[in-house]
Curated annotation (Swiss-Prot):
Keywords: Aminopeptidase, Cytoplasm, Hydrolase, Metal-binding, Metalloprotease, Protease, Zinc. It comes from Exiguobacterium sibiricum (strain DSM 17290 / CCUG 55495 / CIP 109462 / JCM 13490 / 255-15). This is Peptidase T. Its main location: cytoplasm. The gene is pepT. InterPro entries: ArgE/DapE_CS, Bact_exopeptidase_dim_dom, Peptidase_M20, Peptidase_M20_dimer, Peptidase_M20B.
């Protein structure tokens, strides 16, 4: 199983599948199509049924039940794309056998060093087989590790018919990293009662609560005049954007918040004297606080226009997803089964809120309650990303155990 997971993740990681905010196609990048087609072939090869990829790049497949018991259809999902935060081109995964707890030189030339001094969690992986980057790209274990684990779990169930299970659906979705993953997901065609995203981090993560999320684009308009004759004429939109940013509560940013605390996050600032465009994401677990954050921004824009003239600044706000807890709590048996499945494989469940979102955040509001389980990875979205292959094995075993538990609960 370990070898299969390494082989699969290495193959998937080498395909550049970064999504693209600016694109209006689905998927937003050609690389996601490349991976989708590869997965279709692999699903057929391992013996899955009803293997499809639709016009939007959503891959689906079925593992038929091997028992006549009345077991609800469950699903497992992972996403094709990788984050936009750091390059995913020419990924070159590195394997570290029996990690010794010391510094890992990812790239001697640059240099890039993955050190337990900077990332103390590394000490949890002494003796493990690790997969790392070469220091020049992200790894893409988010979420290609989840794809590898689901694929390996399905192959295990197919080759071990003595493990009884109900009908299982799997899906691999595009554009999750830019919040569009479920936008064209056909819940009716997927035809599952419950599902799990395999899109978490370290060993044991079990999550059924996510942020409420919105995105804001704020455009500042200025007036460009030759600087030599600009007195009382020039309006520098960049300075207005900086002043606006300084009006936001400085301690309510990602680098200063944790647990259930929300934030405003400045993700992009592009401008000139004439025009500056600023992108924010807004996050909070509490729905009323989430709405208050959005109101704060719109009120600040109104204040700006009153002070500097109508049309000086404009805002576009759109909600991305909501806290999935509201939709999962009425079906807590799916969390309980995942909890028991982890314990049955020697994994201590860690139930905590997702300081982010998954496809499950939106799918749960589309009628498919979908909590999230771990993959085994750490430091996602950057050059220090790594994953324990040993914990990938555990994640695969947990997927198998969830299928078993649903079958057992139907007896």
């Amino acid at each position: 199983m370990k070898h299969d997971l390494i082989r699969r993740l290495t193959t998937y990681a080498k395909i550049d599948t970064q999504s693209d905010y600016a694109s209006t196609t689905v998927p937003t990048t050609d690389g996601q199509w490349t991976l989708a087609r590869l997965l279709v072939d692999e699903l057929k090869e391992i013996g899955m049924s009803d293997v499809t990829v639709d016009a939007n790049g959503y891959v689906m497949a079925t593992l038929p039940a091997n028992t006549d018991a009345d077991i609800p259809t469950i699903g497992f999902l992972a996403h094709l794309d990788t984050a936009t935060d750091f390059t995913g081109t020419n990924v070159n995964p590195q394997i570290v056998e029996a990690y010794d707890g010391e510094d890992l030189v990812l790239n001697a030339t640059l240099p890039v060093i993955l050190s337990p001094k900077d990332f103390p969690a590394l000490k949890n992986y002494v003796g493990h087989t690790l997969m790392t980057t070469d220091g020049t790209t992200l790894l893409g274990a988010d979420n290609k590790a989840g794809i590898a684990e689901i694929m390996t779990a399905m192959h295990h169930l197919i080759t071990h018919p003595e493990i009884k299970h109900g009908r299982i659906r799997v899906a691999f979705t595009p554009d999750e990293e830019i919040g569009r993953g479920p936008h064209h997901f056909d819940v009716a065609a997927f035809d599952a009662k419950f599902a799990y995203t395999v899109d978490g981090g370290p060993l044991g993560e079990l999550e059924y609560e996510s942020f409420n999320a919105a995105a804001a684009e704020i455009i500042f308009h200025g007036t460009n005049v030759h600087p030599g004759t600009a007195k009382d004429k020039m309006v520098n939109s960049q300075k207005h954007a900086m002043a606006f940013q300084n009006r936001l509560p400085g301690d309510e940013a990602p680098e200063f918040t944790d647990g259930f605390e929300g934030f405003y996050h400045l993700i992009s600032f592009e401008g000139s004297v004439e025009k500056t465009t600023v992108q924010y994401i807004i996050r909070d677990f509490d729905r009323s606080k989430f709405e208050a954050r959005k109101h704060f921004l719109t009120a600040l824009v109104e204040e700006w226009n009153k002070k500097y003239g109508a049309g000086s600044v404009e805002i576009k706000l759109n909600d991305q997803y909501y806290n999935m807890r509201e939709k999962i709590e009425p079906h807590m048996e799916i969390v309980d089964i995942a909890h028991a499945a982890m314990e049955s494989r020697g994994v201590t469940p860690i139930i905590k809120p997702i300081r982010g979102g998954t496809d499950g955040s939106q799918l749960s509001y589309m009628g498919l309650p979908t909590p999230n389980i771990f993959t085994g990875g750490e430091n996602y979205h950057g050059k220090f990303e790594f994953i324990s292959v040993d914990n990938m094995v555990k994640a695969t075993e947990v997927v198998v155990a969830i299928a078993e538990r649903f079958a057992q609960s139907a007896k």
